[in-house]
């Protein structure tokens, strides 16, 4: 197992859940946390602990984004009209790395970040190398022609474990994806339950 996979699956073990729905996740075989004390019985979490866990799980799902970036998304979510929890999810799903992953251009959220950093993605015909770039409705995301035969892309095309959500119009032949609308929480194909309202409570306390 590579160091990247070890770090990724450490999040799974800490949460005690297979948060990306991957077949090779270690929690498919055991349900305790990482480290020598991982097998100790865990007591009931306090309200604070439950909220913190919800935040860690959602942050981890989006390739363990930094606290600074995550808090900035929370602040923006609370300033928008409507439900702040729904807004939080909608903003996270507008990240370029999330869309590259959802479109199945790459096999993992971590790979999406690396793929974008290395300049393999264009938005509306222009190269964008910022994973947190905020995609707008109607934007077209594509894999650069020179990058379409990379192993990561070919691997992702063969994955049967996740479907492309309805808020993306994807052409796998051309390796393009159009962002058609901002999704609600119920439309996002999380393999495990996410609780954005607990995250809003965590930061609001």
UniProtKB/Swiss-Prot annotation:
It comes from the Bacteria. CDD domains: S4. Residues 94-157 form the S4 RNA-binding domain. InterPro entries: Ribosomal_uS4 (IPR022801), Ribosomal_uS4_bac-type (IPR005709), Ribosomal_uS4_CS (IPR018079), Ribosomal_uS4_N (IPR001912), S4_RNA-bd (IPR002942), S4_RNA-bd_sf (IPR036986). Residues 18-49 are annotated as: Disordered. Gene3D superfamilies: Ribosomal Protein S4 Delta 41, Chain A, domain 1, RNA-binding S4 domain. GO terms for molecular function: rRNA binding; structural constituent of ribosome. GO terms for biological process: ribosomal small subunit biogenesis; translation. The keyword Cell membrane does not apply. Coiled coil: none annotated. One of its GO terms (cellular component) is small ribosomal subunit. Keywords: Ribonucleoprotein, Ribosomal protein, RNA-binding, rRNA-binding. One of the primary rRNA binding proteins, it binds directly to 16S rRNA where it nucleates assembly of the body of the 30S subunit. Belongs to the universal ribosomal protein uS4 family. Part of the 30S ribosomal subunit. Contacts protein S5. The interaction surface between S4 and S5 is involved in control of translational fidelity. PANTHER family: 30S 40S RIBOSOMAL PROTEIN, SMALL RIBOSOMAL SUBUNIT PROTEIN US4M. This is Small ribosomal subunit protein uS4. It comes from Afipia carboxidovorans (strain ATCC 49405 / DSM 1227 / KCTC 32145 / OM5). The lineage of its organism: Bacteria, Pseudomonadati, Pseudomonadota, Alphaproteobacteria, Hyphomicrobiales.
């Amino acid at each position: 197992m590579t160091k990247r996979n070890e770090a990724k699956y450490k999040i799974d073990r800490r949460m005690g859940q297979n948060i990306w729905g991957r077949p090779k996740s270690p929690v498919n075989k055991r349900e305790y946390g990482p480290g020598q004390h991982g097998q100790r019985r865990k007591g009931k979490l306090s309200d604070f602990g439950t909220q913190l866990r919800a935040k860690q799980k959602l942050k981890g799902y989006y390739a363990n984004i930094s606290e600074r970036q995550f808090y900035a998304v929370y602040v923006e979510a609370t300033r928008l009209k409507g439900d702040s929890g729904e807004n939080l999810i909608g903003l996270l799903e507008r990240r370029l790395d999330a869309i590259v992953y959802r479109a199945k251009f790459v096999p993992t959220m971590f790979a999406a970040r690396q793929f974008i950093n290395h300049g393999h993605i264009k938005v509306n015909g222009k190269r964008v190398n910022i994973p947190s770039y905020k995609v707008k409705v109607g934007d077209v995301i594509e894999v650069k022609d020179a990058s379409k035969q990379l192993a990561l892309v070919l691997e992702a095309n063969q994955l049967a474990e996740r479907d492309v959500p309805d808020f993306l119009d994807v052409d796998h032949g051309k390796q393009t994806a159009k962002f058609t609308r901002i999704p609600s929480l119920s439309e996002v194909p999380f393999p495990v339950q996410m609780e954005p309202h607990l995250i809003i409570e965590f930061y609001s306390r």
